[in-house]
Amino acid sequence: MTPPPPPPPPPGPDPAADPAADPCPWPGSLVVLFGATAGALGRDLGSDETDLILLVWQVVEPRSRQVGTLHKSLVRAEAAALSTQCREASGLSADSLARAEPLDKVLQQFSQLVNGDVALLGGGPYMLCTDGQQLLRQVLHPEASRKNLVLPDMFFSFYDLRREFHMQHPSTCPARDLTVATMAQGLGLETDATEDDFGVWEVKTMVAVILHLLKEPSSQLFSKPEVIKQKYETGPCSDSTVPCPYSSKADVVDSETVVRARGLPWQSSDQDVARFFKGLNVARGGVALCLNAQGRRNGEALIRFVDSEQRDLALQRHKHHMGVRYIEVYKATGEEFVKIAGGTSLEVARFLSREDQVILRLRGLPFSAGPTDVLGFLGPECPVTGGTEGLLFVRHPDGRPTGDAFALFACEELAQAALRRHKGMLGKRYIELFRSTAAEVQQVLNRYASGPLLPTLTAPLLPIPFPLAPGTGRDCVRLRGLPYTATIEDILSFLGEAAADIRPHGVHMVLNQQGRPSGDAFIQMTSAERALAAAQRCHKKVMKERYVEVVPCSTEEMSRVLMGGTLGRSGMSPPPCKLPCLSPPTYTTFQATPTLIPTETAALYPSSALLPAARVPAAPTPVAYYPGPATQLYLNYTAYYPSPPVSPTTVGYLTTPTAALASAPTSVLSQSGALVRMQGVPYTAGMKDLLSVFQAYQLPADDYTSLMPVGDPPRTVLQAPKEWVCL
């Protein structure tokens, strides 16, 4: 009987599974790839948006240390012009590139040759290895996107030789500063200095560096490939390491991962923005389209990337093109991104919790429209995900509808079918449909939840300008064409000897709507003769390389301009408030118990509301006035006081300079009335409508005498209130 054979020996350790025995965990081949464009080279490769013109590659088998055939292929570029740097480094010409194959043909040849070389070296999987990330992320993927080419799967993962080298030799310079020459020099490799074929020397040197690194024992070498996302992931933005159901305003976003894109077409979507940054890894839901005050897109977007290296590459796409428009790319902060994309509503969180959904925005819905109406409008051919659960209506804080809504669709085809309903009729209104994003949903909901787009302002401080003495004599001069930087000292120097004839508080600078100097000024002189002499002496004199017109005018004309009217060569137009009085009214102050009023309180309420209840006119009657800073809040001019120099800053009633009392009117309007502000008045309301509201509160005709300044003609009961109404 034959004895049974001895049992087989136990299997030994697999060399592929033992890191100490095999320094390369990657089980396949490496395809060393080098490329160049018609523009910038090196670290700036792809920053000028030029086309690819050259590909050089060679296959390396890490375990057997075998290498395949070196291949070189030219690529025809749409723009035949070569930069000086490229022409000197490569030695190529426009004629040689014109005879080359286009990019799609070259990529087909590349795949066929790589598969053949890998099969000769033993077969198995393979992965690209490049010098840096610019070739794939900044050149190949953006160009393929512009030309609508579909890249094979091999171009979506690769090894960065710089990063692998820096992992083995961290004491060298940062990975982004490494080059093929510095890596070879750091390893002490001898390179072929006689090789002058552009791209061939780089590939041969990269292969030598890889083979030298494989001799060093390491379990990390070629273990973590770089991955390029094939598509942009929509949905609520979340941290790539700590997923969350939705983006919250409490989230902290690294500012080194955010950029701002400006100049986007208004109809562009988040997918269009992600396509502009093709080749870079945008974080999930990382495209936040910005809206203006009216809730419409303003052509800007904030984009969040997965790391700072992707952000630095995105900044190199500054002024690259989206269609025919160039897009500006700047740095942004994480706080700005959270402000746009973050939210706090649980309703929005539940709405955005569904992944891989296409969001559309519906605008212009009837206020009475409900979920059933919207679903009927879209029709059965484009069903909403979850039915009524896939609709989100935007409402005011009090629950009133805004006419906006968002809808979720399961795929791009259903969204395209829904977009064909753009400007379709629902009832008597046409509905607009747009692509939207999770960040836009957050923005719109946050905007309406935080209050109206145009909030109601608090009652402003109503300043009382310095009183202007009535009169029709032309005792004032108008300076036109002043430099915007002109100061009161410049005006006094410009007038020269005539500055001695200026009245106290007699220089008035006219400001524009933004509170900046308009180039005009009015000066009150002591008499009409002095004003005429100053105009004749100073007309068209030069101040800071500009000639200034000096013309005489009356106090009435000056008052109209300072209160908002205009004075031109064709005549004088009244101010917007249509007040019949020719000069700002003046008011009396009243003696009362001294009271300390906080500055914040005085800045929010009219001064009449801060006065004590008991108001007894004092004698003699002083003139009350507001300082310049308070005047700027309401009127379009600033009064300066050259003699004596006074610059009060306290808000409220101040003691009037003694010199001002001489020019004040002898009788002023008493404070026996009250000022009423009406909000919510219909646009069609007229003067009679407003007077009818206060019909029961009119004063007897005899009481108007004490309320009118001296010199006003007698007025009837129906005429008097009209002049105190400002529309």
UniProtKB/Swiss-Prot annotation:
Q: Which InterPro entries match?
A: ESRP, Nucleotide-bd_a/b_plait_sf, RBD_domain_sf, RNaseH-like_sf, RNaseH_sf, RRM_dom
Its keywords, alphabetically, are: mRNA processing, mRNA splicing, Nucleus, Phosphoprotein, Repeat, RNA-binding
Chain positions covered by the region annotation Disordered: 1-22
Keyword Transferase in the entry? The reply is no
| Induction conditions | Down-regulated during the epithelial-to-mesenchymal transition (EMT).
Using the record's annotations, give every residue carrying the modification Phosphoserine.
S83, S573
Q: Where is the RRM domain?
A: 257-353, 358-438, 475-555
Query: What quaternary arrangement does the UniProt entry report?
Result: Interacts with RBPMS.
State the name under which the record lists this protein. Epithelial splicing regulatory protein 2
